[in-house]
Amino acid sequence: MIAPPRKIPGLVPPGLILAGGLSRRMGSNKAMVTLGDAPLLSHVIRRVTPQVSDVTINAAITDKGSWAEGFGLPLLPDTLNGHAGPLAGVLAGMRHFRDRETAGSHFLTAPADSPFFPNDLVVRLCEHLSDDAIVIAASSGQLHPVFALWPVALADDLEDWLKNDANRRIRAFLARHVTIGVAFPPLETARGSLDPFFNINTPDELALARSQLETMET
């Protein structure tokens, strides 16, 4: 569904990095794999920090602490038990940012495994803010729901939705709400075009990201 854009001048939303995945295909915590000179998550933090008012990491916290403590940012665990996928992180963000005194209507999510997303991601998405619409990044005709501005007003609805264990697919939840897709062009590199929302799930994809990063740094 498409809603008319409503630009809100001066809005800088908070950001939530989704880092609660199980990394099954990588075989280890992919947020901590080395890309260039730093962990993958560090690249995401560097890229998102200038675009948002502040950054929080959605990651598990146990009685022994959290693997993400070393990044020096606030940590926000899922509010649901088990592993309910990215929507559980989105719900935690909705609750967290809705309850803050300085909270606006929306907050940004970005995944911990996508290091090359656009430097103007938030500016472009904010140009299309519209009440309770979910504003989603897109490329090559595909939506990327983990890169989105989420309305905090949907918290109760999302929590009710996730009470059914069958409701884990993010696109099924999106189908129930107004969404706005914002298209971004490919990233041009010395090795050719790259989807700016390319994400790293496997060792082969990590090798590709390392190769791409080398061309960007030379």
Curated annotation (Swiss-Prot):
GO terms for molecular function: GTP binding; metal ion binding; molybdenum cofactor guanylyltransferase activity. The keyword Cytoplasm applies. InterPro entries: MobA-like_NTP_Trfase, Molybde_CF_guanTrfase, Nucleotide-diphossugar_trans. GO terms for biological process: bis(molybdopterin guanine dinucleotide)molybdenum biosynthetic process. It comes from the Bacteria. Keywords: Cytoplasm, GTP-binding, Magnesium, Metal-binding, Molybdenum cofactor biosynthesis, Nucleotide-binding, Transferase. SUPFAM superfamilies: Nucleotide-diphospho-sugar transferases (SSF53448). Mg(2+) binds at D113. Its EC number is 2.7.7.77. The N-terminal domain determines nucleotide recognition and specific binding, while the C-terminal domain determines the specific binding to the target protein. This is Molybdenum cofactor guanylyltransferase. It comes from Agrobacterium fabrum (strain C58 / ATCC 33970) (Agrobacterium tumefaciens (strain C58)). The gene is mobA.
